[in-house]
């Protein structure tokens, strides 16, 4: 086993991430910000103040993806599923940076209520992130 084993508790308000071999549990608001006039997406760790100052921010990403909703950010309309993908990409970078490892061997995600639509959304996200 060379890759990371990550556990994630994914909710509309906050996401908690733990990684085997790390003592830290990261808590991140389930929201994503986009820097104006760029393609740079960011999440904010609560321990770092949780601020996404100067950015357009979208939250409740699970609900948005589940209802096939959209959000307009910086004049561009994004599907909720796309925003969830960008959020997960950014959040998974946190344990990758902390461990110095890129490969994710196992990812376990818990959600408040398991629904078929949500499982489909998360499977699309895993494909996008190239996680088997």
Predicted regions located by residue number:
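Phosphate/ATP-binding catalytic cores across multiple sugar-kinase/actin-like superfamilies
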Residues: 83-99
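Early-domain small/polar-rich strand-loop-helix modules and first-structured segments
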Residues: 1-72, 127, 132
